[in-house]
A protein has these predicted regions:
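Residue-level detector of intrinsically disordered, flexible termini
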Residues: 6, 10-13, 28-35, 52, ...
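Mobile gating loops/cap/lid regions near enzyme active sites that modulate substrate access
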Residues: 140-143, 147-303
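Short linear motifs centered on Gly/Pro in flexible linkers and helix caps
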Residues: 6-8, 131, 285, 293
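Substrate-gating cap/lid region and adjacent catalytic-acid/histidine neighborhood
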Residues: 8-206, 217
């Protein structure tokens, strides 16, 4: 499926697709006729999974819809976690592979990039790979989404979850930090989940207190469109000038450092082949090749 609105097909009544730009399309009938083995055979290559701008359900890309202010004018809660990338970064990252990949990908900007995402050891290379994925795939996207809510009147409430769920030594996720989905049991006040990665956690009173607070925010938001209420730390609507988020760590506070976007702006926004659109602080990139092949490299690791 295509997630880029600039790449569309001209499907005629015979069901034939005409490729107008990358990636290549095939007729819907052919896709429906594919066997399960055919589908499973190509599944490992489908790194990205995003909405398709089909001109009907989605008349345009999500980015363009928000840029034009055509999204539903309703409040939103959005956010990301401090260590989103730990669950998506392979252990096979190597020091040489990481450094060579950065130099190949970023050319004259490589040294600046490496100063921001350094790698002097295999462990540091892996940690930097985690940070790249966390920033580019989650942190940047959530911040951009919050900024683009300026095109409508409803507010966005941005959070940054940095609490590391406690886990017994030896647990498969014990060293994953504030990993992808770590906030979910807190939000729904349910520490009894039995599926990984949130099972077998040694949640304590700090966790239960955070959970009570987060669940209250979500209940208030569902009822009124505003997460705030009596006894809760004030959660301000996102203001691009203040650039703050509600940080949920060992305590709850409003924090500018939680956004952690200085490094992604510095390291990525000035790359020569990326066109940054400064419109209410939002950024996009110019081509399918740049957008998707670059992120595929970042996601899969250079090692």
């Amino acid at each position: 499926m295509c997630t880029d609105s600039s790449a569309k097909t001209n499907a005629d009544s015979a069901g034939k697709g005409t490729k107008t730009s990358k990636p290549e399309f095939i007729p819907l009938a052919a896709m429906r006729a594919a066997s399960a083995d055919d589908v499973l055979g190509v599944a490992p290559e489908l790194v990205l999974s995003q909405a398709t701008a089909d001109g009907w359900v989605f008349p345009d890309s999500i980015y363009n819809i928000f840029a034009a202010g055509d999204q539903h004018d309703v409040p939103v809660i959005i956010g990301s976690n401090a260590d989103e990338g730990t669950m998506f970064t392979p252990p096979s990252v190597t020091l040489a592979g990481y450094q060579e990949g950065v130099r190949r990908q970023y050319g004259e900007f490589a040294e600046e990039f490496l100063a921001t995402y350094p790698a002097q050891s295999v462990e540091e290379a892996w940690q930097s790979q985690v940070a790249i994925f966390t920033d580019s795939t989650f942190g940047w996207e959530m911040r951009t989404w919050a900024r683009m809510m300026e095109t409508v009147s409803s507010p966005a409430y941005l959070y940054y979850f940095s609490r590391v769920p406690p886990a017994p030594e030896g647990d498969a996720f014990a060293h994953y930090g504030a990993y992808h989905t770590a906030e979910i049991p807190y939000v729904f006040d349910n520490f009894g989940v039995s599926t990984a990665p949130n099972a077998n956690r040694d949640y304590d009173e700090t966790d239960r207190g955070l959970s009570d607070t987060l669940a209250s925010y979500w209940i208030n938001f569902a009822a009124t469109g505003d997460p705030n209420g009596p006894g809760l730390h004030e959660w301000p609507a996102f203001d691009p000038d203040a650039d703050e988020a509600l940080e949920v760590g060992d305590t709850i506070q409003v924090s500018e450092k939680a956004i952690m976007m200085g490094r992604i702006q510095k390291a990525l926004a000035e790359i020569a082949d990326v066109r940054v659109v400064v419109d209410r602080g939002a950024a996009t990139v110019d081509t399918y090749d740049t957008r998707f092949e670059r992120l595929e490299d970042l996601a899969n690791g250079f090692g």
